Amino acid sequence: MSIQNPRTNFIEVFFRMIFGNMQILLLGCPVFKANGCSLPNNTERFFIMAEYFNPGESRSLFNFTTSLQNLLEKKNYHSRDIILVCIGSDRATGDCLGPIVGHKLARFCNTHKNSLHLFGTLEQPIHAKNLEATLQFIHSCYKNALIIAIDASLGVVEHVGYITLGEGSLCPGVGVDKNLPEVGDIFITGIVNLSGFGSQMLLQTTHLNLVMQLADFISLGLFRCLMHSQFRSSLKCAE
């Protein structure tokens, strides 16, 4: 469970006038590190952009897929294994977004095992107890892998029900005060509830319908983008 920090609102209002639907996450200050992403390894970068998508808007899925494809191109995905790490537990409604996304994509990933690998499903979730071991396994087996991290997050009231996408790592568990390894080169989160006190209780009282809507959006967007990516990779191999 990642967190979208409500204290970034005054920053967001200013930068949205410039960047539209892009939220700027300033880095280097602990206040902002809790906002669903971690400090990048390259300390010369001063901010991360996280784009917000409202599943209820007609072009959101197209825009999400396009933005994700652009990030994959930027990360030179053609020559790398793509790893999906769907984080969360099936024991709390608000934290099961990742495993549900993994469950929905499992069959597709199984048919593209040569370059696409999935960790985290309802049957085999990736959570606080096995995340570190899973990451060690990934880094030992897949050299120069491109990791896409998917997790639920908490946020301000106007962002509940939104999807975020950006370049950088997630800090899983920050929303519920857990210290876990950073994950991902690209992050995707679904904002399932409000951030604040009593986060553990919020996970138990989150509406499953909202989680399913977010999971449907993320899994369909990933499916369309990765299908397109696999097709383009096949063309490059044919050349």
Stretches with model-predicted labels:
Residues 2-10:
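Extreme N-terminal basic, low-complexity initiation segments
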Residues 18, 28, 41-147, 152-239:
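N-terminal catalytic or cofactor-binding beta/alpha core of small enzyme domains
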Residues 10, 14-15, 19, 32, ...:
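Aromatic (phenylalanine/tyrosine) cluster motif
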Residues 5, 21-24:
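Polybasic, lysine-rich low-complexity intrinsically disordered segments
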